[in-house]
């Protein structure tokens, strides 16, 4: 996996998160993918379950903003750092929550993610 392909995948990830399109979400992952939302919890297993987990608690349209970039790519593995920001409404004039993120991902040869683990840290004092 080349760095440019990881960047393309991250762009598609952001678009899928913004749209909540089941097709766009599903296209990111292999059929048997595993997704760790939290390192101390069981992962979500399988593309269908991952799509369903994304669709459970949707943010209002236009309130999410993500910026992510690969910091290391080795074969089919990538480590990504970025920021997830959430706003009061779609004007994005009032930031309500944000997290610094690290993703560790493994891809298949077609560029679909087969393993996704994320860690996130909120600013001190954020509820």
Language-model features and meaning:
Residues 13, 25-26, 33, 46, ...:
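Hydrophobic pocket/interface hotspot
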Residues 5, 51-127:
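A beta-strand edge to alpha-helix "cap/lid" segment located at domain peripheries
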Residues 32-34, 96:
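Short hydrophobic/aromatic segments of transmembrane alpha-helices and their interfaces
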Residues 34-44, 57-60, 119:
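A short gly/proline-enriched turn/hairpin at secondary-structure junctions
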Residues 14, 39, 70-72:
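Structured beta->alpha junctions
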Residues 1-31, 127:
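Short, low-complexity N-terminal intrinsically disordered segments enriched in polar/charged residues
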């Amino acid at each position: 996996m080349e760095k440019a392909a990881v960047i393309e995948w991250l762009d598609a990830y952001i678009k899928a998160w913004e749209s909540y399109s089941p097709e766009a979400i599903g296209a990111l992952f292999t059929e048997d993918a595993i997704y760790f939302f939290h390192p101390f919890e069981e992962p979500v297993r399988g593309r269908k379950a991952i799509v369903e987990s994304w669709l459970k608690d949707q943010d209002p349209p236009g309130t999410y903003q993500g910026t992510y970039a690969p910091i290391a790519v080795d074969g089919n593995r990538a480590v990504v750092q970025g920021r997830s920001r959430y706003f009061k409404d779609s004007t994005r004039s009032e930031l309500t929550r944000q997290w610094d993120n690290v993703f560790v991902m493994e891809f298949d040869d077609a560029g679909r993610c087969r393993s996704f683990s994320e860690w996130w840290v909120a600013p001190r004092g954020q509820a």
